[in-house]
Structure formats: structure tokens, C-alpha cells
Design a protein with these regions (language model features):
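A surface/extracellular/periplasmic glyco- and lipid-processing/surface-interacting theme
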Residues: 2-212
Length: 212
């Protein structure tokens, strides 16, 4: 799995709301503050003792793509090593229930036709999701080319695509160009599945609340 990248406070908010264990490689000052203040279970490759165990660096990626794109992990490694950390809670907290409900196997989504979805993130990054009726998945492209699984060489496909509308702004005084992204409150959005789209409303009461 990778490359594992640096944390931002809005990632931490989403992880906390889903009672997740958060793995990252470095992070913004705001992300570290959020991890410390909100009590997120986090493992950091850059400022922690986990490189060479939970994480490792791929030297070929480091040479060809840069240091920040070289950190990897795997599901097998995570499952094997997490129980060895005695301080870590491996079960969901009392009362936690997964907040989102998707279709059961064999059910088909209803809505207006949506065979291709183009999502512009910035002037240089646009995500495209093209519905493939044979697989029932949206095939992912970015930077004008297929987004490929490095293990299989196949184009990545996803069943569900959620587009959430929220406020995004540059952090005042941040020389690195980092952004503030609202993850709490409510907002409108779109849900794409099975080549169809439905309008939705999302909600997240506070940082510790799940996204619904």
C-alpha cells in the first residue's frame, strides 16, 4: 500500500470519526496538534520508531519518484504487527456503529444516469471516474491517464464514488500553501453507483462524530 503520505488535520478528523487507526508519514503542524489533542491512535513513519517495521522505503521509488513517494506498507504487515503494541485498542469503542449504509450484494442503485464523473480538485489535478458496465465499477483516471494498481498493473475500479461539497481555503500565513477544509457541520453532495447519481446531504456534528 502506498505511497503513504503526510497527515493533515482534516484526515485526522475523518479517521477519528470512524474510530480508525491512523497510519501516516509526517504531517502538517495542524495534523500533529489534532493527533495529540483528539486522542487518535496514530503511527508515524517519519517522526516515530516504525520505519523498517510497519513501514519501509522502496528504494526504486525513492530514486525515480522522490523521498516523499517511497514509503510503503501492506495490509498483512499491519494485521501482523498491530497486536504487538500493548497500548493500542484493537476493538471499536463501546457504542460505535458503522454510520454509512450501501447497497446489498445484487441490488442496483437508482438515480439519473452518470456514466462518467469528472472532479476538478485544482488547476493541475482532475479525477475522472468512468463507469464500466462489465465490472460494475467506476474506472479511475488522473493526470490524463489510467490510475493503475502497482501490484497487478490493472486500472483501479471502485463501486461507490462520494463527492462532498464543503468550504476550502488557503491557511493564512502558511508558506507551504496548505489548506483548511471543513469536515464538520452539514453539506450537499453526490453519490455515484452503478452508473447512476443521487443527490445527498452529508453530516458530521464534530470531529469525533462519524461522517453520515
Amino acid at each position: 500500500i502506498g505511497s503513504v503520505r503526510s497527515a493533515r488535520d482534516y484526515y485526522v478528523s475523518l479517521a477519528l470519526g470512524h474510530d480508525a487507526i491512523f497510519l501516516h508519514a509526517g504531517g502538517s503542524p495542524g495534523a500533529y496538534t489534532a493527533i495529540d489533542n483528539w486522542g487518535v491512535s496514530a503511527f508515524d513513519c517519519v517522526n516515530g520508531p516504525y520505519e523498517g517495521t510497519l513501514f519501509w522505503r522502496d528504494q526504486q521509488r525513492r530514486k525515480n519518484m522522490g523521498l516523499e513517494h517511497s514509503v510503503l506498507t501492506s495490509g498483512e504487515t499491519i494485521q501482523e504487527l498491530l497486536p504487538s503494541y500493548s497500548w493500542l485498542r484493537l476493538e471499536h469503542k463501546d457504542g460505535y456503529t458503522y454510520p454509512q449504509t450501501f447497497l446489498e450484494e445484487g441490488q442496483k442503485a437508482q438515480g439519473d444516469s452518470a456514466q462518467s464523473v469528472t472532479i476538478t480538485f485544482s488547476t493541475y489535478k482532475t479525477g475522472v471516474f468512468t463507469y464500466d458496465p462489465d465490472s460494475g465499477l467506476y474506472l479511475v483516471s488522473e493526470y490524463g491517464q489510467p490510475y493503475v494498481d502497482g501490484n497487478t498493473g490493472e486500472q483501479v475500479g471502485v463501486k461507490n464514488v462520494l463527492v462532498l461539497r464543503t468550504s476550502v481555503s488557503n491557511l493564512e500565513g502558511d508558506d507551504a500553501g496548505r489548506q483548511a477544509i471543513r469536515t464538520t457541520g452539514t453539506g450537499e453532495g453526490l453519490f455515484f453507483c452503478d452508473g447512476t447519481v443521487q443527490e445527498i446531504t452529508w453530516s458530521k456534528e464534530k470531529n469525533s462524530s462519524p461522517l453520515t
